[in-house]
Amino acid sequence: MQYNFKVEAFEGPLDLLLHLINRYEIDIYNIPVAKITEQYLSYVHTMKELQLDVASEYLVMAATLLQIKSKMLLPKQEEDVPDNGEDFIDDPRQELMERLIEYKKYKQVATELKEREQERAQLYTRPPIDFTSFQQEEETSLPLDVTLYDMLAAFQKLMRRKKAKTPVTTRITRQEIPIAQRMTDILQQLEVRGGRQSFYDLFADEEREIMVVTFLAVLELMKNQQIIIEQEHNFDEIFVSSSNKSV
């Protein structure tokens, strides 16, 4: 059964690279190309496995990373060293690093502008606030913004678990479930569970086809803002909550 889900509603290849850099706490000025390439290709492979409509830019970036990786493995040529004896480093990562730094700045500015816009909207529309309620309020850390790539990482983890449990010989019963039906099922399941549950609990049925449909249904619900995805810290468990918003 063919499922098509457009990734364009989420992010692009530079976002994926920044996600990996943040997730694995990598120094953006000293990117381990072999590691980042392996992780990047793993994500792209998962997107293609899920039959997501992967933009060509992802594949171009994959080719760029492989090219940089191959250049990093080449021995230094004598002609690359200047005659004056000064150290000269022609780093194949330089252009990519500059693009990432520039894009990171752009993302930060965009986030700040969005926050200011939200603050202005609250200033003119919200009713007076009773500030006494803030006096005894303790500081709490807000959940991380969960992206498509966090969700893909969680799905990869699910598939690794399934692979470890799957016997050598299995009988596959192919079931076709419409994504819209699975979306309804998930919302009903959340309602029964009090509006919030673990992301992994949505995958009680370990049939691969159903797992794929469930994951795509979660992405659609995210895109429609019908559910809220929360994760306290990197690698922590992901929770799904109903936003009580109908479409």
Curated annotation (Swiss-Prot):
The keyword Transmembrane does not apply. Participates in chromosomal partition during cell division. May act via the formation of a condensin-like complex containing Smc and ScpB that pull DNA away from mid-cell into both cell halves. This is Segregation and condensation protein A. Its main location: cytoplasm. The gene is scpA. One of its GO terms (biological process) is cell division. It is found in: Cytoplasm. Transmembrane segments: none annotated. Keywords: Cell cycle, Cell division, Chromosome partition, Cytoplasm. It comes from Bacillus mycoides (strain KBAB4). One of its GO terms (cellular component) is cytoplasm. Component of a cohesin-like complex composed of ScpA, ScpB and the Smc homodimer, in which ScpA and ScpB bind to the head domain of Smc. The presence of the three proteins is required for the association of the complex with DNA. Belongs to the ScpA family.
